[in-house]
């Protein structure tokens, strides 16, 4: 009877790991359902202050076909071009 709880624990751990492993394979991320960047949070209140964007790689594609490193770089560039470039999608441009 002492081995019975070990079998249950082993089964529960294996089934959990299997679920986690296969859920990432079959469910691809749908970037079209993600919200557009909230650029207000990246724009400094003082016009003389330069925005300090983090060095994080999370590509954003703009309407001009340029891929930006992340939302912050896109938002800063969008402000500098007086909002002529628009958000296209998350990920690299095709």
Swiss-Prot record:
Localization annotation: Secreted
SMART domains (UniProt xref): KAZAL (SM00280)
GO molecular function annotations of the record: serine-type endopeptidase inhibitor activity
GO biological process per UniProt: negative regulation of acrosome reaction
Alphabetized UniProt keyword annotations: Disulfide bond, Glycoprotein, Protease inhibitor, Secreted, Serine protease inhibitor, Signal
Feature type site, description Reactive bond: 55-56
Glycosylation-annotated residues: 55
CDD domains per record: KAZAL_FS
Pfam assignment, any one: Kazal_1
Disulphide bonds in the chain: 39-75, 53-72, 61-93
Principal subcellular localization: secreted
Signal peptide: 1-23
Gene Ontology cellular component list: extracellular region
Positions of the Kazal-like domain: 33-94
Task performed by this protein: May be a serine protease inhibitor. Essential for sperm maturation and fertility. Inhibits sperm acrosome reaction, protecting sperm from premature reaction.
PANTHER family, per the entry: SERINE PROTEASE INHIBITOR (PTHR21312), SERINE PROTEASE INHIBITOR KAZAL-TYPE 13 (PTHR21312:SF36)
Name this protein carries in UniProt: Serine protease inhibitor Kazal-type 13
Source organism of the structure: Homo sapiens
Gene: SPINK13
